[in-house]
Every structure is written in C-alpha cells, then in structure tokens.
C-alpha cells in the first residue's frame, strides 16, 4: 500500500481536523481545502442574495400589511446573510469583487431552486417553509463545520432562518385552512416546490465531485443523502397538518429503516437547471448585474469618503 508523506504543517492541520478544532483564517491550510471552502461558501452567499429576488417580487403584492412587513423583514435578513457569508469567504484571501464576478459570469453556482418562478402568493409560503426548511437542515449541520468563520456565521444565520421557515409555513397554513381556491393554491405551490427543495441537497453522494473530500476535512458533517432523508422525514407530518396531499406518491414509512422511503428525484431536471436551463436562470443573473451596476455610485462614494478620511487622519498624525 502506498504511503503519503505529510509535512509537519499537513500533520498539524489533520490533527486539528480529527480533534474537531476549528481552522482559523491565519492557520495553515491545504490549497485544496481553501478552494473547496471558497466554492461552497461563495455558493451559499450567492444563494442568499439571488434568493431575495423571487420573494422580493411579492413585497408590493402581499395580501395584507402584516404579510408585507414580515416578508420585507425576511428579504432584508437574506441580504444580511449574504453579507455575513461574503465577509467570511473573504477571510480565505479572495475579494468580494472576484466573488461577484464569478457569479455574474456563470462560473459560480447558487441554489438551483431560485431559478423557479414564484407565480402565486402560495409560492412565497412554500419557499419559506420548504426552501428555508431545507436550508436549516443543511445549515444546522454546518454549525459544526471545520472552518471557524463559516461555523460562527451559521450559528447566527440559523436563528434567523428558523423564523423564515415558520412564517412560510404559517402563510401556507392560512391558505390550506381557507377557501377551496386558497387550499388549491397551497397544494399547487407544494407540488411545484417540493421536488426542487429535495434537489437543494445536491446529487447522490456517489455522484458528487466534492462530497468525499468535504467530509474528510469536516467542511461537511453529514452527507447529501442523509440530510435529504432528514428533510423528507420531517416534512411528512407537516404536510399532514396542512391537510394537503403529498407530492411524492411513493412516500412510505419503512419500519426497518426507521425512515420514509421516497420516490426518485428527476435528476435530468436538476442538472438542466444548474447548467443554466431553468425558467429564470438568465433573468436572475441579469437582474443581479443591473442592480450591481446601479449601485456603482454608492460604492465609489464610500471608497472616496474612506480615502479622504484616511488622508486627513494621516495628515493629522504627521
């Protein structure tokens, strides 16, 4: 069996990983570990920012002032989550400008579910309940990730995501307990967003290019399939409370496994969407580019102010 000689730096790095110690920005780390983190963390940040679009589209059309205020607060939270995660990613030696350029060029990915349109108010509830619910399952696990800034960011973000999930479920519950037309709207939203929510956990681990190494380095603490199973299990009783039909006609409790057996995901659809062929891929990125360009003057003004402030400070010191 071939043995791989490790340097003292690599040995110390792996010792920390195995001891569940956090890797901090100034610690030595393998370049592949750094790149893997940049890929995952930036994708997470991009998802928070792009995810504002399908919900923000409904702020002016929310059915009541209360719903509008809650949705506005939620979308603002998502912006904050993106900023936390961009800042955490920058500790790995990459600039915000580089991260945004990768998103806008299509080089970097974001959660595929945000390339589906929000056609009704029920979709806003489904996003809060299913999409943020899936995100919580993933992010609770990431609170134990090996990279310190990412772990600490997840602890704060999860507290806010739990509110997002509850507001989405409560909105859908109101529809499900309403008129026949409202209940049908809730059912339609569930049918359209359930399967894309399952896709959020990524491909089967056997087909994932990054899972094995991410697990070894404890960037990820649970596999894609294990996280997806948790989400499936918790969603079944929630659907029952709503009084809606489960979109997966093959869902069945497996006494031996202690989990629900589920139907197979349409992976052709998954890969088609992440490769840019979803309903809204082009629209989402174009909107981001337009908003970024419109904000250039703000960034320039802040830069000029800071330069002037620093120059004045240096002059006073001299």
What is each PLM-predicted segment?
Residues 1-24, 46, 98-108:
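Acidic, low-complexity proline/glycine-rich segments
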Residues 22-42, 102-128, 145, 178-182, ...:
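Acidic/His metal-coordination segments adjacent to aromatic residues that form catalytic metal sites
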Residues 116-167:
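Internal, conserved structured core segments that host functional sites
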Residues 184-318:
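Extended, helix-rich structural scaffolds rather than catalytic motifs
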Residues 33-44, 62-81, 124, 149-161, ...:
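Alpha-helical scaffold segments that form or flank carboxylate-/histidine-based iron centers
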Residues 145-196:
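Glycine- and acidic-residue-rich phosphate-binding/metal-coordinating active-site segment common to enzymes
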């Amino acid at each position: 069996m071939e043995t791989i000689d490790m340097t003292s730096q690599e040995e110390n790095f792996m010792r920390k990983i195995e001891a569940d110690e956090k890797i901090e920005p100034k610690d030595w780390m393998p370049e592949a570990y750094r790149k893997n983190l940049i890929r995952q963390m930036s994708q997470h940040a991009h998802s928070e920012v792009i995810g504002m679009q399908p919900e923000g589209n409904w702020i002016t059309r929310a059915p009541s002032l209360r719903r509008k205020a809650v949705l506005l607060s939620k979308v603002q939270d998502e912006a904050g989550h993106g900023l936390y995660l961009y800042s955490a990613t920058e500790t790995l030696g990459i600039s915000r400008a580089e991260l945004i350029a990768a998103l806008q060029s299509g080089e970097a990915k974001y959660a595929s579910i945000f390339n589906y349109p929000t056609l009704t108010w029920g979709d806003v509830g489904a996003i809060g309940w299913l999409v943020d619910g899936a995100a919580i399952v993933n992010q609770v696990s990431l609170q134990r990730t090996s990279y310190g800034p990412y772990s600490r960011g997840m602890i704060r973000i999860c507290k806010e995501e739990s509110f997002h999930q509850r507001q989405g479920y409560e909105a859908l519950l109101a529809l499900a307990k309403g008129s026949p037309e409202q209940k049908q709207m809730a059912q339609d939203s569930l049918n359209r967003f359930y399967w894309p929510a399952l896709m959020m956990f990524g491909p089967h681990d056997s087909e994932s290019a990054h899972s094995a190494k991410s697990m070894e380095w404890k960037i990820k603490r649970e596999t894609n399939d294990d996280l997806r199973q948790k989400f499936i299990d918790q969603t079944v009783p929630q659907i029952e409370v709503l009084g809606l039909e489960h979109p997966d006609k093959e869902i069945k409790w497996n006494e031996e496994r202690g989990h629900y057996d589920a139907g197979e995901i349409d992976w052709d659809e998954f890969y088609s969407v992440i490769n840019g062929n979803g309903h809204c891929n082009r629209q989402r990125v174009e909107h981001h580019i337009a908003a970024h360009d419109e904000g250039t003057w703000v960034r320039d003004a802040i830069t000029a102010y800071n330069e002037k402030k620093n120059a004045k400070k240096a002059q006073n010191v001299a």
